[in-house]
Curated annotation (Swiss-Prot):
HAMAP family linked to this entry: RNApol_bact_RpoB
Pfam families: RNA_pol_Rpb2_1 (PF04563), RNA_pol_Rpb2_2 (PF04561), RNA_pol_Rpb2_3 (PF04565), RNA_pol_Rpb2_45 (PF10385), RNA_pol_Rpb2_6 (PF00562), RNA_pol_Rpb2_7 (PF04560)
SUPFAM superfamilies according to UniProt: beta and beta-prime subunits of DNA dependent RNA-polymerase
GO biological process: DNA-templated transcription
Protein name: DNA-directed RNA polymerase subunit beta
Enzyme class, UniProt record, top EC level: transferase
Gene Ontology MF terms in the entry: DNA binding; DNA-directed RNA polymerase activity; ribonucleoside binding
The keyword Membrane appears for this protein: no
Record key words, sorted: DNA-directed RNA polymerase, Nucleotidyltransferase, Transcription, Transferase
Catalytic activity: RNA(n) + a ribonucleoside 5'-triphosphate = RNA(n+1) + diphosphate
Enzyme Commission number(s) of this protein: 2.7.7.6
Transferase in keyword set: yes
Length: 1370
């Protein structure tokens, strides 16, 4: 196998027993594909699919005027190139977006010449119209909105279609199941059907008042007879003089109790009265040739007439359909000579009379009356004119403008009602309504099953593209209304399309969605894993989704269809549990938005390499084996029974029945969960915490790869976009800390393209969470790269692998109570080595505005500040980069004009003596806030157009241009070197007709001559061969063209930088100062492993006091062993053992390198290590130099991969431990024979501890809950306006709440003075606290408590209730 540039530097030993048949797909595919489909920017306008922007435009256009003589048609749209790139937008606080320009035609028809059938075109005006700006997605799947990176989270919502359910017996006290159906369109009115406890079927539109369903059936054109014919089968009777003959239908008789003696043709009694009719009885009757049965008169009484019965002589209706038969009615029928009679066949069991009963409750007579009833329900109080009634009914379900079932809805609807085709009209049809009512009645009759709304076949994902399209449609709909009103004017006035279209509604809709929607979220950038997880999140919340308060347990619970689609582990703790989920590792979306997961096809128990993606609906049809099913050498399933799943149930089946098999054991979990080694040994709750806390790990100064990983680390790092990967293969030409220049391979450089790739690295950039984004090159000059190779590491990555923590030597033992209740004891060495030191960057902004009293000014000339306080500011009043600042230091000097105040004579005198300036401005400089300190790492100055730039702003622009020129020079250098190489090959050996340095005609060109001539003069050589001469000329033209294009791009960049910045209104100048703060580990910081084992640092202990091994190796961290058994996260113990083996193996390799062993010995040891168990590695493909380089990288520990659910077994761990620690080493370290525990010694006394201790290496993380951010102190500060009590919280510089229980504690101690102080002067006694302050200033400590303000508030509250209460002072 071929290893990438970084993989071969450090191969991760994998214990996976199953070769992956499918590589993990690109993890941001869902987001990126959805937005590409929305924009279709790369497709030619005429080849665009009807989706996204194209669909939105086609839906809104053409717009026709009210009179029909003016029409506006949409032709195509184009996206302009964005004015600024992503980094520029972030710096300037702009939105990374592209302008949409739509080409529209305004067609005016001739009124005189046009007829109703055909219109004659009078005039056509075509124009490109600006249609707002659409934000563009960055390469990393995020959006830059107003300078900040945001993510649009995908929404999991109920799919359009029809759903049948029941209330589970909760509505009625008897526990009767009340069935209901709901037709949900993508856009339009919801239609509900529901049974009530009396078995009458009702319908509702948009959850309004319920009405009998037969009203709706009449409104769609059915009458009583057709309604009954659709829902019932009929019994046929022939009336006799007394009684009647009933047509014998065996199925209908079976199971009934005979109400009279049943006789056959011969008159023999087959079933006696009151006996149940069985299958034997009906068979006897059939065999005797019985076709009809005599029934008594009372058998007909109460039966329901199926059709209208008309007297043929008079034309009078004797009985209407749905009338009940009575003695009187039977008499009438006989008198009229009616012999044949059809009645409804009903029974209690599976043929209920529900529709018949509903029809009886319905008072409407015909179709129009039914529609009027619906109109009155929808528009109460409005007069129902015929036109209005018909228009409303059409608009409810039959108008494509107001009702859209969507492709998904139609597919789901047809599938549910049992139709074969998946396409059809996007509006409702009469057949649809009838089909739904039939199925609902069938369900009530006991046939069929209700739907499970939590099944992923009934929930679909709305991605960013679809959500943005809906917003764009909203904007276009608003435009449509406005344009329709104004189109009439276009006939009289010479208006162009841009006069009619105002793009503001579109811009407003998009701005509102991307800036403020619940699904548009501030991107979590704590570390690369947090970034990637945020983009793969699916939320059930948001517009059109659920709300936290109303979501029940069922929606939140893990469903069988989540398998391979949604992670059952990763979800937040708290009120959002189960509502926000993560996409599983291999999951993708199908064309309808349903989540699919891949499976390998199995044919005749042989597992093939064919892979099919199945949605939750399709999966229910198959038997699917697990990924760890045993296979023989030919890939056949072995064993009599195979563990498999069918319809969500786990079953054991024979190998022949299996149709599919999982592609990977890790396919059920998400990215974050798949990064937890030994996940299968952790309790689910702790695994959830582990996956969630991995996202909160702060990037540390020197990232370190996990010794025990899962093999997904590289995929996650590369797909997150944190690392820099080579876009094309080539050779590294130049490297420094800020840029990498790669000379591209000839094969990959397209004709006419510049064969140079320059990667500018991000240095000390602030993330959304104030962590540090920083890239470091990992290549050197001359390295050969292939496309996709990692060339630079980012934050929290190490050699292209995700590295969110540090490998620490852990000991599980109590230590003087310092690790009680999950506290963590840590060695001073960890702090000294900066293992957990992180850099945090704060952005501080100051704006100079235009005020009523004059303009604010950014200056060094600030009143009442000493020179010492100003010594770090430059002449522009801005601090220099590199300054170390403390709380209160001035960063940017700013003065604001003050209002004129009347001055006393003394002040006037002082002003006259000391000058005017100091008094009419006040100091509003930007200073370092309390609790902050650090180093200034960057300053950015933005100036509004028309305002003169200061020196600092000009210097920043010059530096930026210098950097850009450097890039262009590098590109030009490589392009020219490449061109001159080609020229040299072209000219050597050719005959010349003359050239520089008096080259004689007919001279053969050689290398010596060319070396002697200046390269730029090679173009002056005149080759004798015309072909060579033309090639030389074309190379020259190409070089000149390249140089010209570089000059143009430099000019464009200069223009961008020198033009004025877009600033908020009223702002003249804005300065951003970036402070970098180093945060070392300290007590109070939160730390965690990857298994949900979290804790707070309790003490940092000197190295010499830490428990140590026999050879003097001290532990880095001591954890409490009691934290393991009750939490059931045993994975951490296995990780510690395997980490211990990894470290030992690294030390053995290090010893071999130190002893300068032969490469053959190294290869042999590595072969034993990599190829004796687990997945084998192709070490033979590496050269000796590469083996040595890899060995040097392994000295700190051999990285292991233990894939989830397919990881290292106990035997594997033991093998590695034995290999890592030969007997001599184990003895020196004081290890037990199994190498899993060691004898530790107390660092303070040197005594051995009572028993051996589990020690080993664990990947431990520092989380983004730092004590520095949480802790603060206050003496005086802001107070609440009404109660006059101090505010709460660090952000408000608030105080500590002394609550009810704390008051009880003081009361219990009898600390009366302290209590009085707490309730008065330290809280809300305004006068008292002022006096205390004064007395402290004077050096006295007397406290005079007064009246708390809260008492006055209470008095006011009581007075508001009308009770006057006064306080009498005695």
């Amino acid at each position: 196998m071929a290893y990438s540039f970084t993989e071969r530097k450090r191969i991760r030993k994998s214990f996976g027993n199953r070769e992956s048949v499918l590589t993990v797909p690109y993890l941001l595919q869902m987001q990126k594909d959805a937005y590409i489909a929305f924009l279709q920017a790369d497709r030619a306008p005429q080849k665009r699919m009807v989706e996204g922007l194209q669909a939105a435009f086609q839906n809104a256009f053409p717009i026709v005027s009210h009179n029909g003589f003016v029409e506006m048609k949409f032709i195509e749209y184009n996206l302009a190139k964005p004015a600024f790139d992503v980094r520029e937008c972030q710096t300037r606080g702009l939105t990374f977006a592209s302008a949409v320009r739509a080409k529209v035609q305004l067609i005016i028809y001739d009124r005189e010449s046009s007829t109703s059938q055909s219109k004659v075109v009078k005039e056509v005006k075509e124009q490109e119209v600006y249609m707002g700006e659409v934000p563009l997605m960055t390469d990393k799947g995020s959006f830059v909105i107003n300078g900040t990176e945001r993510v649009i989270v995908s929404q999991l919502h109920r799919s359009p279609g029809v759903f049948f359910e029941h209330d589970k017996g909760k509505t009625h006290s008897s526990g009767k199941l009340l069935f209901s159906a709901r037709i949900i369109p993508y856009r339009g009115s919801w239609l509900d059907f529901e049974f009530d406890p009396k078995d009458i079927l009702y319908f509702r539109v948009d959850r309004r008042r319920k009405m009998p369903v037969t009203i709706l059936l009449k409104a769609i054109g059915l009458n009583h007879e057709s309604i009954l014919a659709n829902f019932f089968v009929f019994d046929n009777f022939r009336l006799m003089d007394s009684g009647a003959q009933m047509e014998f239908v065996a199925e209908r008789m079976r199971g009934e109790v005979a109400r009279f003696d049943l006789t056959d043709k011969a008159g023999k009694v087959v079933v006696a009265k009151d006996k149940r009719i069985t299958v034997r009885h009906t068979r006897e009757l059939e065999q005797s040739g019985t076709t009809s049965i005599s029934v008594p008169e009372d058998f007909l009484i109460g039966r329901v007439v199926a059709k209208n019965i008309i007297d043929t002589d008079t034309g009078e209706i004797i009985a209407k359909a749905n009338d009940e038969l009575t003695e009187l009615l039977l008499k009438k029928l006989r008198t009229a000579g009616i012999q044949n009679l059809q009645v409804l066949y009903t029974n209690e069991l599976d043929q209920g009379a529900y529709i018949s009963q509903t029809l009886r409750a319905d008072e409407t007579a015909d179709e129009f009356a039914a529609r009027v009833a619906i109109y009155r329900m929808m528009r109460p109080g409005e007069p129902p004119t015929e036109d209005a009634v018909q228009a409303l009914f059409q608009r409810l379900f039959y108008n494509p403008d107001t009702y859209d079932l969507s492709r998904v809805g139609r597919m789901k609807f047809n599938a549910r009602v049992g139709r074969d085709e998946s396409t059809g009209p996007m509006v409702m049809t009469n057949e649809d309504i009838l089909a739904v009512v039939k199925i609902l009645v069938d369900l009530r009759n006991g046939n069929g099953e209700v739907d499970d709304i939590d099944h992923l076949g009934n929930r679909r994902v709305r991605c960013v593209g679809e959500l943005a399209e809906n917003q764009y449609r909203t904007g276009l709909a608003r435009i449509e209304k406005a344009v329709k009103e104004r189109l009439g004017q276009a006939e009289q006035e010479p208006l162009m399309p841009h006069d009619l279209i105002n793009s503001k509604p579109i811009s407003a809709a998009l701005k509102e969605f991307f800036g403020a929607s619940q699904l548009s979220q501030f991107m979590d950038q704590t570390n690369p894993l947090a970034e990637i997880t945020h983009k793969r999140r699916v939320s059930a919340l948001g517009p059109g989704g659920l709300t936290r308060e109303r979501a029940g347990f069922e929606v939140r619970d893990v469903h069988v269809t989540h398998y391979g689609r949604v992670c059952p582990i990763e979800t937040p703790e708290g009120p959002n549990i189960g509502l926000i989920n993560s996409l599983a590792l291999y999951a993708r979306l199908n064309e309808y938005g349903f989540i699919e997961t891949p499976y390998r096809r199995v044919a005749d128990s042989k597992v093939t390499m064919e892979i099919d993606y199945l949605s939750a609906i399709e999966e229910g049809k198959y038997v699917i084996a697990q990924a760890n099913a045993a296979l023989d050498n030919e890939g056949r399933l072995t064993g009599d029974l195979v563990s498999a799943r069918e319809k969500g149930e786990s079953i054991l089946v024979s190998a022949e029945r299996v149709q599919y098999m999982d592609v990977s054991p890790a396919q059920i979990v998400s990215v974050a969960a798949s990064l937890v080694p030994f996940l299968e040994h952790d309790d689910a709750n702790r695994a959830l915490m582990g996956a969630n806390m991995s996202r909160q790990a702060v990037p540390v100064l020197r990232p370190e790869k996990p010794l025990v990983g899962t093999g997904i680390e590289r995929v996650a790092a590369v797909d997150s976009g944190t690392v820099v990967t080579a876009t094309r293969g080539g050779v590294v030409d130049y490297v420094d800390a800020t840029r990498i220049v790669v000379r591209v391979n000839d094969a990959e450089a397209l004709a006419g393209e510049i064969g140079v790739d320059i990667y500018n690295l991000i240095k000390y950039q602030r993330s959304n969470q104030n962590t540090n984004i920083h890239q470091r090159p990992i290549v050197k000059m001359g390295d050969k790269l292939a496309k996709g190779d990692v060339v630079a590491d980012g934050a929290s990555t190490d050699l292209g692998e995700i590295a969110i923590g540090q490998n620490m030597l852990i000991g599980f033992m109590p230590w003087n109570g310092y690790n009680f209740e999950d506290s963590i004891l840590i060695s001073e060495r960890v702090v000294a080595e900066d293992r957990y030191t992180s850099i945090h960057i704060e952005e501080l902004v100051v704006m100079a505005r235009d005020t009523k009293l004059g303009s604010e000014e950014i200056t060094r000339d600030i009143p009442n500040l000493s020179e010492q306080q100003l010594n770090r500011l430059d002449e522009s009043g801005i601090i220099y980069v590199g300054a170390e600042v403390q709380p209160g230091d001035t960063l940017v000097g700013k003065v604001t004009p003050k209002g004129e105040t009347t001055l006393t004579p003394e002040e006037k005198l002082l002003r006259a003596i000391f000058g005017e300036k100091a008094s009419d401005v006040k100091d509003t400089s930007l200073r370092v806030s309390q609790g902050s300190s650090g180093t200034v790492i960057d300053v950015q100055v933005f100036t509004r157009e028309g305002i003169t730039r200061d020196k600092r702003a000009q210097q920043i622009i010059d530096d930026e241009l210098k950097r850009y020129r450097l890039d262009l020079n590098d590109q030009l250098r490589i392009v020219e070197a490449d061109a001159f190489d080609r020229i040299e090959k072209l000219l050597i050996g050719k005959i010349a007709n003359g050239g520089p340095k008096k080259l004689a005609k007919g001279t053969k060109l050689d290398k010596a001559y060319l070396t002697d001539v200046e390269k730029y003069h090679w173009f002056d050589i005149r080759p004798a061969d015309d072909e060579v001469a033309s090639q030389l000329e074309s190379i020259k033209n190409s070089m000149e063209q390249t140089r010209h294009s570089f000059d143009l791009s430099f000019e464009e960049k200069r223009k961008k930088l020198t033009q004025g910045d877009e600033l908020p209104s009223g702002v003249l100048k804005m300065v951003k100062v970036y402070l970098a703060v180093k945060r070392r580990l300290q007590p109070g910081d939160k730390m965690a492993g990857r298994h949900g084992n979290k804790g707070v640092v309790s003490k940092i202990v000197p190295v010499e006091d830490m428990p140590h091994m026999a050879d003097g190796t001290p532990c880095d961290i001591v954890l409490n062993p009691l934290g393991v058994p009750s939490r059931m996260n045993v994975g951490q113990v296995l990780e510690v053992h395997l980490g211990w083996a990894a470290k030992g193996l690294g030390q053995r390799i290090g010893d071999m390198l130190q002893a300068e062993s032969k490469v053959a010995e190294l290869r042999q040891f590595m072969d034993t290590l990599y190829n004796k168990s687990g997945r084998t590695e192709d070490l033979a493909s590496l050269s000796d130099e590469q083996v040595v380089e890899m060995a040097q990288n392994l000295t700190t520990g051999v990285p292991f991969a233990t894939p989830v659910f397919d990881g290292a077994s106990e035997a594997d761990i033991m093998t590695m431990l034995q290999l890592a620690y030969p007997d001599a080493v184990a003895k020196a370290k004081g290890l037990t024979p199994t190498r899993t525990q060691a004898q530790l010694y107390d660092g303070r006394t040197g005594d051995a501890f009572e028993r051996t201790t589990t020690v080993g290496y664990m990947h431990f993380l520092k989380l983004h809950h730092l004590v520095d951010d949480k802790m603060h102190a206050r003496s005086t500060g802001p107070y609440s306006l009404v109660t006059q009590q101090p505010l709460g919280g660090k952000a408000q510089f608030g105080g500590q709440r002394f609550g009810e229980m704390e008051v009880w504690a003081l009361e219990a101690y009898g600390a009366a003075y302290v209590l009085q102080e707490m309730l008065t002067v330290k809280s809300d006694d305004v006068v008292g606290r002022t006096k205390v302050y004064e007395s402290i200033v004077k050096g006295e400590h007397a406290i005079t408590a007064g009246m708390p303000e809260s008492f006055n508030v209470l008095v006011k509250e009581i007075r508001s209730l009308g009770i006057d209460m006064e306080l009498e002072r005695s």
